[in-house]
Amino acid sequence: MEIWYTEKLELEKGRAVSYRVTKTIESLQSPFQKIDIFETQSFGRMFTLDGVTMVTNKDEHSYHEMIAHIPMMSHPNPESVLVIGGGDGGTVREVLKHPSVKEVVLCEIDKAVVDISYKYFPECADAMKDPKVIHHYDDGAKFARDNKGRFDVILVDSSDPVGPAEVLFKEPFFRDMASALKPTGIIATQAESFWYHGDVITSLFEFIPKIFPEYGYYYTTIPTYPSGIIGFTFLSNAIDPYAVTPDPKRVPKGLKYYSPEIHKAAFVLPEFAKAYIKRKG
C-alpha cells in the first residue's frame, strides 16, 4: 500500500501538495509544534513542522544559500551574525562559509528542532557545532531587543506567519531587529511567495519604509515550497540592495545555487509583484 504525506497549505486555502512517503522516521510533539521526519520517494528526507514542509535533502540548498549569501555578500565585512529560527542549521552552515565571520548567534525558540536536526540532517545541523556558534533558546524578538547595536547581519529563518512565528511578521519585531543592527548592518527575513501571499508582502512593506531607508524583496526557487518560490526582505540603514555588485572573489566555493548573476537577478520581479513593494521614487 502506498503512503502519501499531504501538506494542506494554511495560507493558501483550498490547496494541498502530496509526496509519496517510503518511511515515517520519527514523529514528536515539542512544547511549540508537531515535528515529523519522513523519507520520501522524490525529495529524500523531509522535515515538517505542524504539517508544513521545512527542509528536504533535495532542495534545501536553494533556500539556505539565498537567505544567507545575498545579505552576507552585500555587507563589506560581516563579522557578527544573528540567525533567528533556523534550528535545522542550514542557514548557519552558509553563514560560516564567509571567513570574516567571528560569531554566529542562533536564537531558536524550540530546542527540539535543533536536536532532531542533529539526528537526521547532519549535513545542515553539524555546522551548529562550530565554536563560533552561540546557541540561545528563547524568543527572537526579546533577544534582538536586549542586544542593541551588536550585529552586522540578522537573518530570520522562520516558518509561515501562523502560530509561534506570527510575531516575526509584525512591526514591533522589525523595530527590535533594527535596534540590534550596527550602522551598516543588513537584515534578511523569510517573506513568503508573491504568487500566493501578496497580502502578507504588502502588509510588511506598509511599515518597513518607516523603519529602514533601504529595502527590497528578492526570491529563490524551491520546488517543495508553495508555488515553487519563496521570497525574502532585504533591509538596511545604509546599503541599497539594488545597487550591490557582488565581488566574485568573495563567493564561497562549492555553492549549488547562489552566484553573483543569481544575486542580481533575484531582485527582478514580475510586474504584478512590484506592486506589493513600496519603493521610494
Curated annotation (Swiss-Prot):
Domain PABS as annotated: residue spans: 2-237
Keyword terms, alphabetized: Cytoplasm, Polyamine biosynthesis, Spermidine biosynthesis, Transferase
Keyword Cytoplasm assigned: yes
Enzyme class: transferase
One GO cellular component term noted in the UniProt record for this chain: cytosol
EC number: 2.5.1.16
Active site location: 157
Record-linked CDD domains: AdoMet_MTases
Residues that coordinate or bind spermidine: 64, 88, 157-160
Any single GO BP term: spermidine biosynthetic process
Catalysed conversion reaction: S-adenosyl 3-(methylsulfanyl)propylamine + putrescine = S-methyl-5'-thioadenosine + spermidine + H(+)
Name of the molecule in the record: Polyamine aminopropyltransferase
Lineage: Bacteria, Pseudomonadati, Spirochaetota, Spirochaetia, Leptospirales
